[in-house]
Design a protein with these regions (language model features):
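Catalytic cores of carbohydrate-active enzymes across secretory and cytosolic contexts
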Residues: 1-173
């Protein structure tokens, strides 16, 4: 990425974009057709946009300003004082939340239904409250299958093969 657009990389891998409208709009604005094509996945989008378009965006002062504002907003969000930080007494440094699946965003298809969506919403709300929660789960290399019907009416499943390097994931050790 051009220097002035480098914050887009961090914005893309922090899943807050999935519930932060302004950040989603920023990515969509880069190339609306590509945004639709990659299923609203900012990591995939950054790999899809041609270098010429990135240079064009880097020369657009208004766009660069929106990138800088989104970066500053994320920095404040991550470091800012929120509900949890205002609690009195001893607080845990981290809270583990265990679920076999998390429905955070379609760009990270690691859920199949209600349990995953509930777990994802719990992580999002905890994040907004400043709770130091860590979602511990499983990585399904095939993700969630897509359903279709055959010509004779039978359900058919298509399992996508997920490349962890192309997902908004970071391996922690």
């Amino acid at each position: 990425l051009p220097e002035s657009l480098r914050p887009l990389g961090e914005l893309a891998i922090n899943l807050r974009w999935s519930w932060h409208r302004e950040t989603r709009q920023l990515f969509a604005q880069m190339d609306p057709d590509a945004w639709q094509r990659v299923g609203h996945d900012p990591v995939a989008l950054l790999g899809e946009i041609p270098a010429e378009r990135l240079e064009e965006l880097a020369a657009d002062d208004a766009f660069v300003g929106r990138v800088a504002a989104a970066d500053a907003d994320l920095t404040e969000y991550l470091a800012g004082h929120r509900w949890f930080q205002g609690l009195d007494g001893r607080k845990p440094h981290a809270i583990a939340y265990f679920s076999p699946e998390y429905g955070i965003a379609q760009a990270l298809p690691q859920y199949s239904g209600g349990l995953g969506i509930l777990a994802g919403d719990h992580l999002k709300a905890s994040s907004d409250l400043g709770v130091p929660i860590i979602g511990v789960g499983l990585f399904y290399r095939s993700g969630y299958f897509r359903q279709s019907l055959s010509a004779d009416g039978w359900q058919q499943e298509t399992y996508p093969v997920l490349d962890p390097d192309g997902l908004p994931l970071t391996l922690l050790r």
